[in-house]
Amino acid sequence: MKGKFIVIEGLEGAGKSTAVNTVQQFLRHFKIQDVICTREPGGTALSEEIRHLIKKKSQNEEILTDKAELLLLYAARVQLLENIIKPALSSGTWVIGDRHDLSSQAYQGGGRGIKSEFIKSLADFTLGSSFRPDLTLYLDLPPELGLQRARKRGHLDRIEQQSLVFFERIRARYLELTYDDPRIKMIDASKPIKKVTVDIQNALLSLLEK
């Protein structure tokens, strides 16, 4: 039996890492032991190098352009997809992804203002138009709360240092995409962790019952 692909999405500080652990524990409770976790950008040796390029602040005067950022993200994504995710799913392993294609639609589309049609065509070319996660959990919260949480973790990377308005645009695009796709379930990540955990578990139950 083919594995399932579950993706966790959200702004900085939304609690994606905690949600990944919640999903993994829930699947184990239902005797689903063959599970791997991935992150984007990253997940392969080459993709991790690309992650470093995207996340770090430039040490010289060269600025990473918005289009270059988008192309790097899809290069990292297709490496992860073809080398890790697809083989795992084909072998019956479940995959829990910390971010996937929806991030680029929200961050580069909503945040950077790159046309959604171009991002879709790039996604179709690199990932294939028929490949989609079985379930995406979008952890929604106000950007100011997410950034407050992110600052408590310590040093902010290049993306996390963007303006509040940037993250407001991202959230708006996330919400727009969520309403348009029944496979994306919105979780209110501003609520207490116990409530967030229950909401995630309920969304997973719906997937398992299909």
From Swiss-Prot:
Keywords for the protein's UniProt record, in alphabetical order: ATP-binding, Kinase, Nucleotide biosynthesis, Nucleotide-binding, Transferase
Amino acids binding ATP: 10-17
EC number, UniProt record: 2.7.4.9
Single GO molecular function: ATP binding
An individual GO BP term: dTTP biosynthetic process
Any one Gene Ontology cellular component term annotated for this protein: cytosol
Disulfide linkage: none
Reactions it catalyzes: dTMP + ATP = dTDP + ADP
Nucleotide-binding as UniProt keyword: yes
Enzyme class: transferase
Bilayer-spanning residue ranges: none
Keyword ATP-binding: yes
Protein role: Phosphorylation of dTMP to form dTDP in both de novo and salvage pathways of dTTP synthesis.
NCBIfam families membership: DTMP_kinase
HAMAP family tied to this protein: Thymidylate_kinase
Family statement: Belongs to the thymidylate kinase family.
Stated name of the protein: Thymidylate kinase
Naturally occurring in which organism (per UniProt): Hamiltonella defensa subsp. Acyrthosiphon pisum (strain 5AT)
Name of the gene: tmk
